[in-house]
From Swiss-Prot:
It is found in: Plastid, Chloroplast thylakoid membrane. The lineage of its organism: Eukaryota, Sar, Stramenopiles, Ochrophyta, Bacillariophyta. The chain crosses the membrane at residues 2-22. It comes from Skeletonema costatum. Component of the cytochrome b6-f complex, which mediates electron transfer between photosystem II (PSII) and photosystem I (PSI), cyclic electron flow around PSI, and state transitions. The keyword Coiled coil does not apply. The 4 large subunits of the cytochrome b6-f complex are cytochrome b6, subunit IV (17 kDa polypeptide, PetD), cytochrome f and the Rieske protein, while the 4 small subunits are PetG, PetL, PetM and PetN. The complex functions as a dimer. Pfam families: PetM. It is a single-pass membrane protein. Coiled coil: none annotated. This is Cytochrome b6-f complex subunit 7. The keyword Methyltransferase does not apply. InterPro entries: PetM_cyt_b6/f_cplx_su7 (IPR012595). Belongs to the PetM family.
C-alpha cells in the first residue's frame, strides 16, 4: 500500500510538471 501511494504521488507530480511545462511554452 505504501509503495503504491508513493508511486501515485510521483506519477502525479511528474504529470503535473509536464502539463505546466507544456502550457508554459
Amino acid at each position: 500500500a505504501a509503495v503504491t501511494c508513493i508511486f501515485m504521488t510521483l506519477f502525479g507530480l511528474s504529470l503535473g510538471f509536464a502539463l505546466l511545462k507544456v502550457q508554459g511554452e
